[in-house]
Amino acid sequence: MASFSILSIFKIGVGPSSSHTIGPMEAGARFCGLLKGILEQVERVQITLHGSLALTGKGHLSDEAVLIGLHGIYANELDITTKKALLHEAFENKVLKLANQHHIPFDYAKDLIFDNKPLARHQNALILKAFNAKNEVLKEETYYSVGGGFVYTEKELDNLSEEGENESVAYDFSSAKELLELCQKHQKSIAEIVRLRENALKNHPDATMTKIYHAMLECYHNGANSKERYLPGSLKVTRLAPSVKTRLEKHPTSGKDPLALIDYISLYARSIAEENASGGKVVTAPTNGACAVVPSVLSYAKNHLFENLSQKSINDFLLTSAAIGYLYKKNASLSGAEAGCQAEIGVASSMAAGGLAHLCQATTQQVLIASEIAMEHHLGLTCDPVGGLVQIPCIERNVLGAIKAISASKLALEDEYKPKVSLDEVIATMYATGKDMNEKYKETSLGGLAKTLKC
């Protein structure tokens, strides 16, 4: 496998979930690649969603996502017109155009199986099988959607473990302690270390972050200006961002309320989280369920803290945030199904706090402290999406995650602040807490608000 790019913490895709929408779509598209040379022999495909993918798959659109993927389409390539046409063919005409080349019959009730039992390797798993006319299996593969849109086969997961032992990447780091030592050794910021690492891998950090930033802006614009009154699904949740935007345009907050800026932070976060919930184009940061925290904190900095924030500074914020996200992916989890919402909103808040601290001229140590504080106060946060939808409590959690990130950054910048807990320690604690958490509270919609709220 190619060396992991820290830049991939941010991915352009579609809502409402990175693990349950982007991941299954990629699995379907990758499975098409395995059918080269035997595609014309395929008469039927069978999809089995396991664990959290089965329990919340319909609300998270996992079923639709894998069907789109089986047409050979990835999330960053999908447009709404194509999506509607493919799903109409699958659900109404009962036909799939496998790999966008070969038509096969499709029966949703028989060919798409929801198995609530998780596989041993991860809570988010799906098995894809292709059969010939004799009902013999031509090809079979198991995929694990481990959070943040990252998808691996069994073999790839094994290789990930081996890479950690065998592969050497310039300017790489496995812990916050190693990252701090790198920054001190080379007299570089976290963002500069990430640039050096990604350039060594022949990637394009600044061009990529600029593209990511503009995708975030587009998502905000679409959410803030949506003409839809309600989000999709049975909950009939009202899209509030457009009305908040209209109110703030007509009656900008005055200096009388020292906390008035919270309204703007809420607008930024709500716009993006609501657009994600509607299945729109979004950026994983590090997941779809937590996609609004990082960009809303960045918008707060750009629109209210700094005049004329340069594109380089914006990229620095994103690269710093990505480095923090990388530490969680490497040493813990980005999956609500594996570690609860602390692995999504908690990680996003930690990332945003570090990025903002960097913009505020923090030392590397202070950046890491800010990230630690933000996660420390998300520990134990459950993932209990009501109705299997990424709406309640997800949208408002993005707002509060952004506010916590800003508060954490300010705390870390106090000169006399002497932390007792390191970022590495809080990452380990988050993962251990997630492993101990009851499965009802890990993206199954079997406990918490999902159980209490009748919908």
From Swiss-Prot:
One Pfam family of this chain: SDH_alpha
GO MF assignments: 4 iron, 4 sulfur cluster binding; L-serine ammonia-lyase activity; metal ion binding
Free-text cofactor note: Binds 1 [4Fe-4S] cluster.
Reactions the enzyme catalyzes: L-serine = pyruvate + NH4(+)
Pathway stated in the Swiss-Prot or TrEMBL entry: Carbohydrate biosynthesis; gluconeogenesis
Cofactor(s) recorded in Swiss-Prot or TrEMBL: [4Fe-4S] cluster
Keywords (A to Z) from UniProt: 4Fe-4S, Gluconeogenesis, Iron, Iron-sulfur, Lyase, Metal-binding
InterPro entries, alphabetized: ASB_dom_sf, Fe-S_L-Ser, Fe-S_L-Ser_mono, Ser_deHydtase-like_asu, Ser_deHydtase_bsu
Family under the similarity heading: Belongs to the iron-sulfur dependent L-serine dehydratase family.
Protein name: L-serine dehydratase
Taxonomic source organism: Helicobacter pylori (strain J99 / ATCC 700824) (Campylobacter pylori J99)
